[in-house]
UniProtKB/Swiss-Prot annotation:
UniProt lineage: Bacteria, Pseudomonadati, Pseudomonadota, Gammaproteobacteria, Enterobacterales
Protein name: Proline--tRNA ligase
Enzyme Commission identifier(s): 6.1.1.15
Function text: Catalyzes the attachment of proline to tRNA(Pro) in a two-step reaction: proline is first activated by ATP to form Pro-AMP and then transferred to the acceptor end of tRNA(Pro). As ProRS can inadvertently accommodate and process non-cognate amino acids such as alanine and cysteine, to avoid such errors it has two additional distinct editing activities against alanine. One activity is designated as 'pretransfer' editing and involves the tRNA(Pro)-independent hydrolysis of activated Ala-AMP.
CDD domains assigned to the protein according to its UniProt record, in alphabetical order: ProRS-INS, ProRS_anticodon_short, ProRS_core_prok
Any Gene Ontology biological process: prolyl-tRNA aminoacylation
Record-linked HAMAP family: Pro_tRNA_synth_type1 (MF_01569)
Predominant location category: cytoplasm
GO CC terms: cytosol
Family in the record: Belongs to the class-II aminoacyl-tRNA synthetase family. ProS type 1 subfamily.
Length: 572
């Protein structure tokens, strides 16, 4: 490709509305342009990267035995009503009616459509297992699209769905998809972790997220510094303290704390160690409970894990925090003065809280706290559960090493769905025993457009993008200095351009009448891994300057050797 016949569209300045580095660089490098909120046009440079990501995904899915299909973006509402997700999904599901007043949706996922296909096409266990995939545009009406293509409303996704007659068969395919995803992200040159995850609104049993490590990530992921253990922070188990609870050394005293409505204020005003404080959070109880609320207690420096809390049998789902009015109706005190002593509703404490002694907590009286509280002396030990987020330095749940916490960008997610959708849509086949058998499902997604942004978040410097070789828009940039004035520069540039293309190498030759500084800046901005600079001065010695984008290292290579050098560097 020649720049004179190409839409390069680079920008010198960073657009003001671009928050994260990937959004900034995708705009500056001429990869995307915003059409409307959460909607982007992919320009040639961006599309080349997107297609490379897509091709790697397709190759590995085919290698894993998945079968490609293509399903409509527009889906009839009756399928969503049949599955129950018409009511569950929320405003992200874009709903509309056609001219015949029939309701439809723009598909954010395709569980209903593929299950409908399978229930009509398959009849016998002998046809299974099968794993279908597609790479297709999805639409989710995000309330606040942000970070460019990282959280857009329209995006390209690879979604796959497998069907089985046994859990063992599902596990085999799940393991194959796990391995395929690991190969996909490894081939792309990404630093990622596969982490245990919550199944969320999709539902189902086992689940793993594939997270690209990046400071701009929206998810906290935890992993052992020794073993392979890794999990989303929502799912990571906080191990109970291994040391016995210390003996009481203080008497419980009632203290006036009129200006301490938060843990931070309590610690500051009374010079308390924060690890000697307990915070109390009130949430809605399950229906038919004797009490409308449940009290959840965590240590002052810990955070409640809402996913864990929601799974408690005493707690209503979805997790709902009590309002101040609801709290006062039951406790007769405000949210800044709550604690376990004389608490009239069920109490659940975190494992760490159960190991505390001589601690401070609200007295369930406005403007007052108890100091020196001890379990089984001042208040009976309530129900104990793991309800907090882990913190860095906690012991790893697998017993090996301690936990590290980093930010991650979710680029892939695999689920063992079980029979959630097949039961709702009555998808069954005749089993080996001749009886109808409900199918067991798995689903496996990769955010193809998000992968592009995530790769940039891991691969950039002050000059621009530093693409991993496998997904770079071009492999080689040829920069001929003053080619419109120097015949020998132009002749060699054309010769190398043809020879490299003949070797199957993707080349961008900058044949614009631009200053060298502009040419260098543009090629570094769009992140082409290998650059060769052809100039009269070096040609006097039969040399060409070669530069590797990632390391910045430069070297002089003889003109007769440069093609072989690049072929070896790119193809190995």
């Amino acid at each position: 490709m020649r720049t004179s016949q190409y839409l390069l569209s680079t920008l010198k300045e960073t657009p003001a509305d671009a928050e994260v580095i990937s959004h900034q660089l995708m705009l500056r490098a001429g990869m995307i342009r915003k059409l409307a909120s959460g909607l982007y046009t992919w320009l040639p440079t961006g599309l080349r990267v997107l297609k490379k990501v897509e091709n790697i995904v397709r190759e590995e899915m085919n290698n894993a035995g998945a079968i490609e299909v293509s399903m409509p973006v527009v889906q009839p509402a009756d399928l969503w009503q049949e599955s129950g997700r018409w009511e569950q999904y929320g405003p992200e599901l874009l709903r509309f009616v056609d001219r015949g007043e029939r309701p439809f949706v723009l598909g954010p996922t395709h569980e209903e459509v593929i299950t409908d296909l399978v229930r009509n096409e398959l009849s016998s266990y002998k046809q299974l297992p099968l794993n279908f995939f597609q790479i297709q545009t999805k639409f989710r009406d995000e309330v606040r699209p942000r970070f460019g293509v990282m959280r857009s409303r329209e995006f390209l996704m690879k979604d796959a769905y497998s069907f089985h007659t046994s859990q063992e068969s599902l596990q085999e395919t799940y393991d194959a998809m796990y391995a395929a995803y690991s190969r996909i992200f490894s081939r792309m040159g990404l630093d990622f972790r596969a982490v245990q995850a919550d199944t969320g609104s999709i539902g189902g049993n086992a689940s793993h997220e594939f997270q690209v490590l990046a400071q701009s990530g929206e998810d906290d992921i935890v992993f052992s510094d020794v073993s392979d253990y890794a999990a989303n922070i929502e799912l990571a188990e906080a191990i109970a303290p291994q040391t016995p609870r210390a003996a009481a050394t203080q008497e419980m005293t009632l203290v006036d704390t009129p200006n301490a409505k938060t843990i931070a204020e309590l610690v500051e005003q009374f010079n308390l160690p924060i690890e000697k404080t307990v915070k109390t959070l009130l949430v809605k109880a399950v229906k038919d409970s004797k009490s409308p609320l449940v009290a959840l207690l965590v240590r002052g420096d810990h955070e409640l894990n809402e996913v864990k809390a929601e799974k408690l049998p005493q707690v209503a789902s979805p997790l709902t925090f009590a309002t101040e009015e609801e709290i006062r109706a039951v406790i007769n005190a405000g949210p800044g003065s709550l604690g376990p002593v004389n608490m009239p509703i069920p109490v659940i404490i975190d494992r760490t809280v159960a190991a505390m002694s001589d601690f401070a907590a609200g007295a369930n009286i406005d403007g007052k706290h108890y100091f020196g509280i001890n379990w089984d002396r001042d208040v009976a030990t309530p129900v104990v559960a793991d309800i907090r987020n882990v913190v860095a330095g906690d012991p790893s749940p697998d017993g090996q090493g301690t936990l590290l916490i980093k930010r991650g960008i979710e680029v892939g997610h695999i689920f063992q769905l079980g029979t959630k959708y097949s039961e709702a849509l009555k998808a069954s086949v005749q089993g080996e025993d001749g009886r109808n058998q409900i199918l067991t499902m798995g689903c496996y997604g990769i955010g193809v457009t998000r992968v592009v942004a995530a790769a940039i978040e891991q691969n950039f410097d002050e000059r621009g993008i530093v693409w991993p070789d496998a997904i770079a828009p071009f492999q080689v940039a040829i920069l001929p200095m003053n080619m419109h004035k120097s015949f020998r520069v132009q002749e060699l540039a054309e010769k190398l351009y043809s020879e490299l293309r003949a070797q199957g190498i993707e080349v961008l030759m900058d044949d614009r009448k631009e200053r060298p500084g502009v040419m260098f800046a543009d090629m570094e901005l769009i992140g082409i891994p290998h650059t060769i600079v052809i100039g009269d001065r070096n040609l006097d010695n039969d040399d060409i300057e070669y530069k590797y984008r990632r390391s910045g290292e430069k070297s002089l290579i003889k003109t007769g050797d440069i093609v072989d050098y690049l072929v070896k560097a790119i193809k190995g």
